[in-house]
């Protein structure tokens, strides 16, 4: 009975993680799309300062991670010192800002699809720079994802969708998403390097260090430079409290979502987390299509299916590889 009870508790915990990640990030996507397309107030002004979301997100996540460390973490656990995150903090500030800014030029579903193709630059750099040889199925995954994103980008966007964008410009929007992926790649590699050098580093330590530097860099950019948009963004929020409320909810969703991601990775591993977040992106596109009143065409849905088919196949390949490793461990 105890074994069954333990298994049932794990199922409940997994269900909690799935519902937490899905609800937090799907709603955050809705808020992100709202802030990038909606016209606020009687003067129908757009919130043009989308990069300000990064600063707000960093501040909320910094406070959240500090509270979690005080409540749950062991003090002086020998984790990475805060200053080691300075370089990853730079790319983690620039990359997501570019991804958010892309929403001025392309639709939310297009942005989600483009940002789902993270494996493409990873495999490209691995092949060209490090001479890594990948298997045929891995190349097939990349082909499906790259093909789906490329065809989606080439298909004509509806006039209704274009009218909601602040500055429609597909090439610029996709270029910003590509740069976002490149910076994310450096950020992830740096975080892995820090974790390997300081094995006792916990997830909350990483969250605190990254968001501390993110807050510092964003504050300098937003308020320290002559062209900084921080004061304009705050003034906009004062004039349009509805936008300020949406920004606060956006940040809370991000903090809650990160909490469930860390919980998933620590209890079920990174593969389970990848599966949950990948399916969440697909649902986000469906929700965006329904709620925005801009349903995708059959061809566009075909492209979406290509991308997530490739991602699903990649997850399956990782699972098979994990199974082989486990069998080898059992034999030895």
Swiss-Prot record:
<dbReference type="GO" id="GO:0005789">
    <property type="term" value="C:endoplasmic reticulum membrane"/>
</dbReference>
<keyword id="KW-0762">Sugar transport</keyword>
<dbReference type="GO" id="GO:0015297">
    <property type="term" value="F:antiporter activity"/>
</dbReference>
<keyword id="KW-0472">Membrane</keyword>
<dbReference type="GO" id="GO:0005459">
    <property type="term" value="F:UDP-galactose transmembrane transporter activity"/>
</dbReference>
<feature type="transmembrane region" description="Helical">
    <location>
        <begin position="49"/>
        <end position="69"/>
    </location>
</feature>
<comment type="function">
    <text>Essential sugar transporter required for the transport of UDP-galactose and UDP-glucose from the cytoplasm into the Golgi and the endoplasmic reticulum, to ensure quality control of protein folding. Essential for pollen development and involved in embryo sac progress.</text>
</comment>
<comment type="similarity">
    <text>Belongs to the nucleotide-sugar transporter family. UDP-galactose:UMP antiporter (TC 2.A.7.11) subfamily.</text>
</comment>
<keyword id="KW-1133">Transmembrane helix</keyword>
<feature type="transmembrane region" description="Helical">
    <location>
        <begin position="206"/>
        <end position="226"/>
    </location>
</feature>
<feature type="transmembrane region" description="Helical">
    <location>
        <begin position="301"/>
        <end position="317"/>
    </location>
</feature>
<dbReference type="Pfam" id="PF08449">
    <property type="entry name" value="UAA"/>
</dbReference>
<feature type="transmembrane region" description="Helical">
    <location>
        <begin position="11"/>
        <end position="31"/>
    </location>
</feature>
<feature type="short sequence motif" description="Di-lysine motif">
    <location>
        <begin position="327"/>
        <end position="332"/>
    </location>
</feature>
<dbReference type="GO" id="GO:0015780">
    <property type="term" value="P:nucleotide-sugar transmembrane transport"/>
</dbReference>
<dbReference type="GO" id="GO:0009555">
    <property type="term" value="P:pollen development"/>
</dbReference>
<keyword id="KW-0813">Transport</keyword>
<keyword id="KW-0050">Antiport</keyword>
<feature type="transmembrane region" description="Helical">
    <location>
        <begin position="252"/>
        <end position="272"/>
    </location>
</feature>
<feature type="transmembrane region" description="Helical">
    <location>
        <begin position="112"/>
        <end position="132"/>
    </location>
</feature>
<dbReference type="GO" id="GO:0005460">
    <property type="term" value="F:UDP-glucose transmembrane transporter activity"/>
</dbReference>
<dbReference type="InterPro" id="IPR013657">
    <property type="entry name" value="SCL35B1-4/HUT1"/>
</dbReference>
<keyword id="KW-0812">Transmembrane</keyword>
<dbReference type="GO" id="GO:0009553">
    <property type="term" value="P:embryo sac development"/>
</dbReference>
<dbReference type="GO" id="GO:0030968">
    <property type="term" value="P:endoplasmic reticulum unfolded protein response"/>
</dbReference>
<feature type="transmembrane region" description="Helical">
    <location>
        <begin position="135"/>
        <end position="155"/>
    </location>
</feature>
<protein>
    <recommendedName>
        <fullName>UDP-galactose/UDP-glucose transporter 1</fullName>
    </recommendedName>
</protein>
<keyword id="KW-0256">Endoplasmic reticulum</keyword>
<feature type="transmembrane region" description="Helical">
    <location>
        <begin position="80"/>
        <end position="100"/>
    </location>
</feature>
């Amino acid at each position: 009975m105890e074994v069954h009870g333990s298994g049932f508790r794990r199922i409940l915990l997994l269900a909690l993680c799935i519902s937490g990640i899905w609800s937090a990030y799907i709603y955050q996507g809705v808020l992100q799309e709202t802030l990038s397309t909606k016209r606020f107030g009687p003067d129908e002004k757009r919130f043009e300062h989308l990069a300000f979301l990064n600063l707000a997100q960093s501040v909320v996540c910094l406070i959240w991670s500090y509270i979690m460390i005080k409540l749950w973490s062991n003090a002086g656990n020998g984790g990475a010192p805060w200053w080691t995150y300075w370089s990853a903090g730079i790319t983690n500030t620039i990359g997501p800002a570019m991804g958010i800014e892309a929403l001025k030029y392309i639709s939310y579903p297009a942005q989600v699809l483009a940002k789902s193709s993270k494996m493409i630059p990873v495999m490209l750099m691995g092949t060209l720079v490090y001479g890594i040889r990948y298997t045929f199925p891995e190349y097939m995954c990349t082909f499906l994802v790259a093909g789906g994103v490329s065809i989606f980008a080439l298909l004509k966007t509806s006039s209704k969708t274009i009218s909601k964008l602040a500055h429609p410009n597909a090439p610029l929007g996709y270029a910003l998403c590509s740069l976002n992926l490149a910076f994310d790649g450096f950020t992830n590699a740096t975080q892995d390097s820090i974790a390997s050098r300081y094995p006792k580093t916990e997830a909350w330590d990483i969250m605190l260090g990254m968001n501390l530097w993110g807050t510092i860099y964003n504050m300098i950019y937003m308020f320290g430079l002559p062209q900084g948009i921080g004061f304009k963004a705050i003034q906009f929020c004062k004039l349009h409290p509805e936008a300020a409320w949406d920004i606060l909810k956006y940040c809370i969703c991000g903090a809650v979502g990160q909490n469930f991601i860390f919980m998933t990775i620590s209890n079920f591993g990174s593969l389970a987390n990848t599966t949950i977040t990948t399916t969440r992106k697909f649902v986000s596109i469906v929700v965006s299509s329904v709620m925005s009143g801009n349903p995708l065409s059959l061809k566009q849905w075909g492209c979406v299916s290509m991308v997530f088919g490739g991602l699903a196949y990649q997850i399956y390949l990782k699972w098979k590889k994990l199974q082989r490793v486990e069998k080898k461990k059992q034999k030895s």
